[in-house]
Design a protein with these regions (language model features):
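A structural signal for short hydrophobic beta-strand segments in well-ordered beta-sheet cores
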Residues: 25, 143-145, 197
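Short, well-ordered beta-strand micro-motif
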Residues: 27, 144, 175-177
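Conserved beta-loop-beta/alpha segment of the NTase-like Rossmann-fold superfamily
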Residues: 61-62, 66-147, 183
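Catalytic-core segments of class I nucleotidyltransferases/pyrophosphorylases
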Residues: 46, 100-101, 108, 114-121, ...
Length: 206
């Protein structure tokens, strides 16, 4: 299964402490966050990795190269202009497997990816998300699921919230089916949550 790691953002909130390296390359105990992410994937057999890069992408490409010394096969898509956090997917869709993992590049995790993928396949979903509580749900997109864990509603941070919802947000770990990229999306920059995932809420496909 192909893994796509999104590493093209500018990481503006981190500029004050790391202006010369992209956020996924910030070291934690001496090793970049992205290296730890790739290590976790490879340990579970997910070695076919495509990284989308943009701002300071050369730092990532120089560090990981073709991925062989990390036990992976890594290729890259370089965004010459910002495409939003999902725009690059439409540029590389011919390289994707029918189902693929899509991960944020700046997340540290310890999860069973094979179980995650199997859950997605068992439910014949277009999109499967890993969710978690966070410390600032008031400015995050909140996900409301039914008793069967199907996403019933997706509230972007700018949406009104006239009632109380539990604190459940997208962790940036997804299994997607390539058919999600068959839709026509308006605009030059494409937002994953608002334009691709949110429309699936309430359809039984996520």
């Amino acid at each position: 299964m192909k893994v796509v790691i999104m590493a093209g953002g500018k990481g503006t909130r981190m500029l004050s402490i790391a202006s010369d390296i992209p956020k996924p390359m910030i070291p934690i105990e001496g090793r970049p966050v992205l290296e730890r992410e790739i290590e976790c994937l490879c340990e579970q057999g997910f070695t076919d990795i495509l990284i989308t890069v943009g701002h300071l992408g050369n730092v990532i490409m120089d560090y990981f190269g073709n991925g062989l010394k990390f036990g992976a096969h890594i290729t890259y898509y370089f965004e010459k202009k910002p495409l939003g956090n999902a725009g690059a997917l439409f540029q590389v869709k011919d390289q994707l497997t029918d189902d693929f993992l899509l991960l944020n590049a700046d997340a540290m995790f310890d999860i069973d990816f094979n179980r995650f993928v199997q859950y997605h396949k068992t439910h014949d979903a277009v999109a499967t998300l890993f969710t978690h509580p966070n410390s600032h749900p008031y400015d995050s997109g909140v996900i409301i699921a039914d008793e069967h864990m199907a996403v019933r509603k997706w509230l972007a941070k700018e949406d009104e919230r006239p009632e109380y919802f539990k604190n459940r947000v997208n962790a940036g770990l997804h299994v997607l089916n390539k058919k999600i990229l068959e839709q026509t999306v308006e605009g030059g920059k494409i937002d994953l949550d608002r334009q691709l995932l949110k429309p699936l809420a309430g359809t039984g496909q996520m």
